[in-house]
Structure formats: structure tokens, C-alpha cells
Design a protein with these regions (language model features):
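Helix-biased detector of long, well-ordered alpha-helical tracts
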Residues: 1-224
Length: 224
């Protein structure tokens, strides 16, 4: 596969590896809300380090909002689109909610990578959303140095079923919904060191949406 088609070669990091380091991000955001306006309807905001923000609608329901996008963690464009969409949608399910609509975020080096490959990325994201009956209603795109793709997702959750990181208790068991080691597989894939079977396993794991999060929120005794 030529570099023009190997999406992972167009970014320094891949997947979560492209995120700004926590210490740098903490410094960037420090003091942003000091003496700022307080919004009582916001139950979870950017000071909670959670999967999505939460707005209390006042009728027993809450609105969930998240945005997540990545640089390529795989070379297959459709899988990249599906994986990025799955990650964003999973944020809503993780808090006990269900996504109701999404918007796409696309950055693409239009002079470097064929636009037909970008179409495959978009198709992957749409396929993931359609598979869960989540309308992909629009989005925003820019001409960027690195290819990026993701979703901004809106969801709903019953307030009584809302689950946040802060609700976890010291005696809780931890349920792992995906196998560990995805980052290592992705790194091997980027370096061309993974075989066909490993790539297949990576694709299957990355495109799995954690819908089980919403189901677990229905169980008495599940705190976070």
C-alpha cells in the first residue's frame, strides 16, 4: 500500500495517541472558569473529566453532548470512519444514555490524499450511525494538514439512570467491555508490523460500539 493510501502515515500520532498530553491540557484550561458564570442546569461540564457534558432539562430527562475526533488509527478509510464514529457514540452510552443525532467533523489534506478516500471515511461513519438508527444530520469540514474524523453527538438519558465517573465507589467491580491491548495493536499496524489476523481483530474491536453501557445503567447497584 502506497503512502498516499496509508492514512496512518499522515499523522504523528494515531487514535488517542494524537491527544494533547493531560498536563498540557490541564495548564491550558486552568483558571478558565474561575469567577465565571455558573450554569445550574449543567450537571457535568469540563471540570468533571467525563465522557459527555450533561444538561438537566428539568423534566426528569437530561441532554448529553460530546465531541470526539481522531487522526487515523488504521489505514482502511471506511474502518477509520466507523471506528471514530463508534468511539464518539460510545461516550453517550457510557453515561447511561442513548444518542439521538450526530454531526460529522472532517479535516482532510485535499491536495495530498484523494478525496475519494475521504468519501470512504464519511461512509464508514454513516454506516456506524445508521446501524444504530442515529441520524447523521450534518457536519463541518476543513482543509487540514492531517486527516481527522469524528462526531459531535447529542443524546438523552433519564436523570435517574445517569452514570458519571464521580459516582464510582471504592468497592465497585470494574467491567471491561473490550479487550486490553488495542493501543499496541494499533501501533503495530501503523508500523506495518501486524499480520492479517491481527488487523482483522483490531478492526473488529475498534468498530464495536459500547451500547452495553446504557443497558448496565438499568441494573441496580451499577454506580458509574
Amino acid at each position: 500500500m502506497e503512502k498516499s493510501q496509508r492514512l496512518t502515515q499522515y499523522s504523528k500520532g494515531s487514535g488517542c495517541g494524537c491527544k494533547i498530553q493531560p498536563a498540557v491540557l490541564g495548564n491550558l484550561l486552568s483558571g478558565m472558569r474561575e469567577n465565571g458564570k455558573v450554569y445550574p442546569e449543567i450537571l457535568v461540564g469540563n471540570d468533571h473529566n467525563d465522557d459527555a457534558s450533561v444538561y438537566d432539562l428539568g423534566n426528569g430527562m437530561c441532554l448529553l453532548q460530546t465531541v470526539d475526533f481522531f487522526t487515523p488509527m488504521v489505514d482502511d478509510p471506511e474502518v477509520f470512519g466507523m471506528a471514530s464514529a463508534a468511539n464518539a457514540l460510545s461516550d453517550i452510552y457510557a453515561m447511561g444514555g442513548r444518542p439521538i443525532m450526530a454531526n460529522a467533523v472532517l479535516g482532510w489534506p485535499v491536495d495530498e490524499i484523494d478525496i475519494e478516500i475521504a468519501k470512504k471515511v464519511l461512509q464508514g461513519g454513516l454506516s456506524c450511525c445508521d446501524g444504530l438508527s442515529v441520524p447523521l444530520v450534518g457536519g463541518h469540514s476543513i482543509d487540514s494538514r492531517d486527516p481527522i474524523y469524528g462526531l459531535s453527538v447529542t443524546g438523552l438519558v433519564e436523570k435517574a439512570k445517569l452514570r458519571t465517573n464521580a459516582m464510582a465507589k471504592a468497592s465497585d467491580y470494574i467491567a471491561i467491555t473490550k479487550p486490553l491491548g488495542i493501543g499496541m495493536l494499533s501501533a503495530a499496524h501503523k508500523r506495518g508490523l501486524s499480520d492479517e489476523a491481527q488487523n482483522k481483530a483490531l478492526y473488529e474491536i475498534l468498530t464495536q460500539v459500547n451500547t452495553i453501557g446504557a443497558s448496565l445503567a438499568d441494573i441496580n447497584g451499577v454506580h458509574a
